[in-house]
Amino acid sequence: MVKACEFCHEKHLHCDPGRPCINCVKRNRGQLCRDKERKKSKKSGVEKSVGGSDAQSSGSSQSNNTAEVNVSADYTAGTMFNNMGFDPLQQSNYGFDTMTRQNNNNDNTLLNSSNNNAIDMGNRWSSQPDVVDNMVSPNITDGSNTVEFDSAWANNEYMKLDELTKNGPPMMFSSYPNSVTENLDQDNAVEDLPISVLPGSKTKNGTAENLSQFLNIGRPLHKTQSRPYISLDMMTAGMKDDILPPETYNTTSLGDNYLSPINSVGSSTNQLNDYQDSIPHQKTMTSPVLPTQSPSSAFNPAKLPTQVSISAISPDDNNEDDQKSSSGIPSKSDKEKNNKTKKAKEKIFKTSPNDILISKKNPKGHKSTKRKNEKADISPYKFRQLVKVPEDLYEKQYLIKPHNYRHTYKKLLEQLEKIFLSDNSPKRRGQLQSIVKCILEDYVPTFIALTSNMIESDLYLQELTLQRTLLELESMAKLVNCSPICIWRRSGEISYVSDEFLQLTGFKRKEILASRRFIFEFLDPTSIVNYFTNFHEYLAFGSKNQMTSNISLIKQGLLVNGAVVRKSNPIVSSSPMCGTNTDGIFDECHLLLSNGYYLKCATCWTVKRDSFNIPLLIMGQFLPVFEGQ
């Protein structure tokens, strides 16, 4: 039959056999979970002896499980009190009124009387085992709390009361001499204790100790007592002679031993010297603080003097004066060394605050050109001389960096303004407005949505993919050498031109690729407008509605398979073209020649995108159209 615990018995709950039970664990009272003691029935003579032996065995097992210090003269006195249901709160004859520290003057008298009474009672009960066997511990039936006096909670409460009712920290048994702790196991332990250790007497700290530390009423004290509360006296109580408080160190002085202790009240000079020798010398110092400036204040160049004092910065010069006074007149070599160092330091510190800031940014004092160098990317012509095969691309990855498209688009706008606004024609101005409108409505929203989650590493990977794809397209262009080919970025910046394109236009390769040149520089204004319209509609991110566009083209009389085509509408194809897996369109344009004339060409524009569906490269194939006069 399962016995219910005290809580489940009181609340009439179903209790499980485990301890602590589930109900106590749920209510965070697992430490208080114990079996409910039932009323003992009257036993015969045989059962009494068995019960007495069980009580003795339980007492011995309890003492063996925990390492305890027996403070009183006889441990059996405390166990007899517990077995007989002794209530120390009601027995004021045993000196428990001294726990409140209200009668400090009579502590010695109460100690002697209470201890003698406790020892006599323990001897009397131990000499009469029959009486002890007949005693039955009464049950506490208050219904709210069944915890006995000899519990850990009661000991903690008395320890807290001791902290509140006395001036100094409690004296632990670990701080007693060995001779005192050895005498505690004897019958006359309290009588043999020295006066400085007896409760109620004054100790080294000028505080009186508690009587409950020597009376064995309740559970014996454990060797490793814990203090689950914080006291302001813990620092002074746990401080040893060779340890100084943090306030005794000076952290503002400069030098190797900048953690030098200051003389404090109550500490001798020898202790300070020993502790200073024990501190390791710190050779690596933090940034020194000027005497005219607080350590917490920020660096302000305007507040610095035009000529900084060397003695305030360097601690070595202060040490030189001490060496001179101790050793007498310095030698000539020492004077020469000191003069050289002083001249060098004066040369350094005889500068204005602005000169100091300029020297930190640029030693030469002129404007930095780092910003210009960052924008100056490697030209396609020079890059192809360094990277010719895919192996070179991976061996020289330091040449790869994200392309500055912002600067490229800025140059593109300047070029478009130069093309369309040079003659102040209303037609050209309207064409430029249509290009800007097409960019803002068709290209920018989708581009921002695709690139909003990209990081710097993605931009690097995008540029690496572009260069690797460009190598493949160049090798393919060399194999298919029947048509002129030009490859440019999505911003229109030319990256590659084939030999046939150079022969068709009459330009040189270095003339096109050595600097930033756009494909729009080689097209007439009408072809530029058509390019932006077709690129944003079909090539940039794919056709918006491929089926709808094909149906509309068929209705307009545009046939994909070779029928007559209107001149103003391009042919859209979704089949693989020129070895790429991207969409392409057919259209016509006018290509600029080196002599200044435009040549009508049929073009095929193919786009290559990355994994983010962002266009990387556009390849244009140009076939000249010779019309008869």
From Swiss-Prot:
GO cellular component, one term: nucleus
DNA-binding region boundaries: 5-33
Annotated function: Transcription factor which regulates nonfermentable carbon utilization.
Residues covered by region (Disordered): 34-68, 268-376
Keywords for this protein: DNA-binding, Metal-binding, Nucleus, Transcription, Transcription regulation, Zinc
Compartments in which it is found: Nucleus
Species, as recorded: Candida glabrata (strain ATCC 2001 / BCRC 20586 / JCM 3761 / NBRC 0622 / NRRL Y-65 / CBS 138)
Tagged with keyword Zinc: yes
Basic residues bias (residue ranges): 361-373
Biased composition range(s): Low complexity: 47-63
Family: Belongs to the ERT1/acuK family.
Residue span, PAS domain: 472-542
GO biological process: cellular response to starvation
Pfam (any one): PAS_13
MF-aspect GO terms: DNA-binding transcription factor activity, RNA polymerase II-specific; RNA polymerase II transcription regulatory region sequence-specific DNA binding; zinc ion binding
Bias (Polar residues) ranges: 268-299
Protein name: Glucose starvation modulator protein 1
Stored InterPro entries: ERT1_acuK_gluconeogen_tf, PAS, PAS_13, Zn2-C6_fun-type_DNA-bd_sf, Zn2Cys6_DnaBD
